[in-house]
UniProtKB/Swiss-Prot annotation:
This is Small ribosomal subunit protein uS5. Keywords: Ribonucleoprotein, Ribosomal protein, RNA-binding, rRNA-binding. It comes from Syntrophobacter fumaroxidans (strain DSM 10017 / MPOB). The gene is rpsE. The keyword Lipoprotein does not apply. One of its GO terms (biological process) is translation. Residues 11-74 form the S5 DRBM domain. InterPro entries: Ribosomal_Su5_D2-typ_SF, Ribosomal_uS5, Ribosomal_uS5_bac-type, Ribosomal_uS5_C, Ribosomal_uS5_N, Ribosomal_uS5_N_CS, Ribsml_uS5_D2-typ_fold_subgr.
Length: 166
């Protein structure tokens, strides 16, 4: 894999969710913030992270820096995914289905942010079970990691690409 300078890339960053969390101490409550951040290049690479800090902007910045390090490649075919896939994490399940050109991104909240950051323009999605943003993001990314393109499937099966497509 080629290491790319993050300053060379035009990255799309989306804040999925911000939480205020409290630590109870002897003198009362200490508040801090956590931010779920998704980062992508809009061309098939996406990553996510959770940033935590005492201030919201700092939590977002930390999340962005960490998300850049977790980016991975998503196989795309004409701005959609190559096949249907189910991603699961905890009680959250996310169904991802390829869609024809012109359909758009049919997705809600957390899933939409990931699709836009990854550069997927036509897709149908459905969240099943838990709608918790943490688990939905992780389930969606797990589904995207399970995607395989035709060339890889052909190689794994020891066949030619045209045999797989037919």
């Amino acid at each position: 894999m080629i290491a790319l300078e993050s300053s060379q890339l035009q990255l799309i960053d989306k804040v999925v969710h911000i939480s205020r969390v409290a630590k109870v101490v002897k003198g009362g409550r200490r508040f801090s913030f956590s931010a779920i951040v998704v980062v992508g290049d809009g061309n098939g690479r996406v990553g996510f992270s959770l940033g935590k800090a005492n201030e919201v902007p700092e939590a977002i910045r930390k999340g962005m820096e960490s998300a850049k390090r977790t980016m991975f490649e998503v196989p795309l075919v004409n701005a959609t995914i190559p096949h249907e896939v189910l991603g699961r994490f905890g009680a959250a399940s996310v169904v991802l289905k390829p869609a024809s050109a012109g359909t758009g991104v049919i997705a809600g909240g957390a899933v939409r942010a990931i699709m836009e950051a990854a550069g997927i323009h036509n897709i149908l999605t459905k969240c099943i079970g838990s709608r918790n943003p943490h688990n939905v993001v992780k389930a969606t990314l797990e589904g995207l990691r399970r995607l395989r393109n035709v060339e890889l499937v052909a190689k794994l099966r020891g066949r030619e690409v045209h045999e797989i497509r037919d």
